[in-house]
C-alpha cells in the first residue's frame, strides 16, 4: 500500500510498499516521528481516506473499493474512533453525546440513553452524565469520547493520540481504561501514540519511519 500527496508539481510520498496484518483481538500501537504518516495510515485503515495504491482488507472486504456511502456504513457498523481532541458537542450533556450515535442509527431515545448510561458507568462517570463538556475536566471529556466510540459495540477501536492532550497522570488513567475495555469487550485496537511507555504495553508495535513500516518488539521500547 502507498500514499502520495501532491503539493503543487511535487509528489510527497508519505509511505510506500507498506504491508502488515492486524489479527482479531490484538492491541497494536502505531509509532513514529511527527509527520511520519501515523494519522494518515489510521485514516486509511479506518476507511476515512484511500491509499494512492494498493488495498486495505477488513476480513474479505476491500475498503478502498467502497463508495463513500458504503464506507460510512462500514465505519458506523464496525469501527469506533477516539481522537486527540474529544469533539464532544458542547450544547449536549455527556449522556446525550454518548447516546448520539445510537440515535443517528434510529434507536429510540430511552434505549439509547440506557446504553449510554452503561458506558458512562464503564468509564467511571455515571454521576457526571448530566454535565456538559465545558463542565468536565480534560480527562473526563476524553473518557466520555471513549464511551461514545464504544456505545455502538464496534469490533475495532481506532485511537489517534488519545492521551496526547492530557497530563501524565490523566493520560495513564485514560490508557489503562482503554486497555481494560479492549480486554473486557474483546476489541481489536489500533492506537497511534507518541508515548512509547504506552506502546510498550501493547501486543505489537508498528513503527513508521522514512516511508517504511517495520515491526518492533514492544519490550524493546523504553518503559
Swiss-Prot record:
**Quick one: where is this thing mainly located?**
membrane
Task: Write one Gene Ontology MF term.
Answer: ATP hydrolysis activity
Sorted alphabetically, which keywords does the UniProt record give?
ATP-binding, Cell inner membrane, Cell membrane, Membrane, Nucleotide-binding, Translocase, Transport
The record's SUPFAM superfamilies line, in alphabetical order, gives: P-loop containing nucleoside triphosphate hydrolases
Q: What class of enzyme is it?
A: translocase
Every copy of the ABC transporter domain together lies at 1-223
Q: Spell out the InterPro entries in the cross-references.
A: AAA+_ATPase, ABC_transporter-like_ATP-bd, ABC_transporter-like_CS, ABC_transpr_LolD-like, MacB-like_ATP-bd, P-loop_NTPase
The record's section on Pfam families has:
ABC_tran (PF00005)
Q: Does the keyword DNA-binding apply?
A: no
Annotated localization: Cell inner membrane
Where ATP binds, per the record, is at 32-39
Gene Ontology CC: one annotated term: plasma membrane
Is the keyword Cell inner membrane assigned to this protein? Answer: yes
How does the protein associate with the membrane?
Peripheral membrane protein
Give the enzyme's EC designation.
7.6.2.-
Q: Give the protein's function.
A: Part of the ABC transporter complex LolCDE involved in the translocation of mature outer membrane-directed lipoproteins, from the inner membrane to the periplasmic chaperone, LolA. Responsible for the formation of the LolA-lipoprotein complex in an ATP-dependent manner.
Summarize subunit and interaction data from the UniProt record for this chain.
Answer: The complex is composed of two ATP-binding proteins (LolD) and two transmembrane proteins (LolC and LolE).
The entry sums up its family as follows: Belongs to the ABC transporter superfamily. Lipoprotein translocase (TC 3.A.1.125) family.
Q: Which PANTHER family match?
A: IMPORT ATP-BINDING PROTEIN, LIPOPROTEIN-RELEASING SYSTEM ATP-BINDING PROTEIN LOLD
Q: What is the protein's name according to its record?
A: Lipoprotein-releasing system ATP-binding protein LolD
